[in-house]
Amino acid sequence: MSNITIYHNPACGTSRNTLEMIRNSGTEPTIILYLENPPSRDELVKLIADMGISVRALLRKNVEPYEQLGLAEDKFTDDQLIDFMLQHPILINRPIVVTPLGTRLCRPSEVVLDILQDAQKGAFTKEDGEKVVDEAGKRLK
């Protein structure tokens, strides 16, 4: 079993790029397709705490439930926002990566490089053509 876990959405380019950077370090992570297998309340609360971000910072804003539920309004408690994320996992921003070096919301995808123990094994270019890692495995930005 891998010591890296990614909460992944294969339809998301940022999530796909993050997964490939993990693989470029020589590790095959545990992949949780969080839309199909959402985290439990306790797991979600722990992820948020470990990332050191607010509950609201994990909310995706550009999805239908956000508008339908009126989540832009500042009237909801953190517990209520977590309830909404559990009921509508599409509201959980992604990808979230957990490694021995920390837990991060990897937006942009190269944030994952900050928490990988192993160096990149070679060049990495994002799907959009942006070069992130050179041939020697060194981060470019």
Swiss-Prot record:
Family matches, as InterPro entries: Arsenate_reductase, Arsenate_reductase-like, Thioredoxin-like_sf
GO terms assigned for molecular function: arsenate reductase (glutaredoxin) activity
Effect listed in the UniProt record for changing H88 to R/S/V/W: No change in reductase activity. Mutant retains arsenate resistance
GO BP field: response to arsenic-containing substance
Catalysed reactions, semicolon-separated: [glutaredoxin]-dithiol + arsenate + glutathione + H(+) = glutathionyl-S-S-[glutaredoxin] + arsenite + H2O
Keywords: Arsenical resistance, Oxidoreductase, Plasmid
Subunit organization: Monomer in solution.
Lineage, broadest ranks: Bacteria, Pseudomonadati, Pseudomonadota, Gammaproteobacteria, Enterobacterales
Gene: arsC
The UniProt record lists the keyword Oxidoreductase: yes
Impact reported for R60A: 50-fold decrease in catalytic efficiency with arsenate. Mutant is sensitive to arsenate
Listed result of changing E130D: 5-fold decrease in catalytic efficiency with arsenate. Mutant is relatively resistant to arsenate, but is more sensitive at higher concentrations
Effect of D128A: 4-fold decrease in catalytic efficiency with arsenate. Mutant is relatively resistant to arsenate, but is more sensitive at higher concentrations
Record-linked CDD domains: ArsC_ArsC (cd03034)
Protein name listed in UniProt: Arsenate reductase
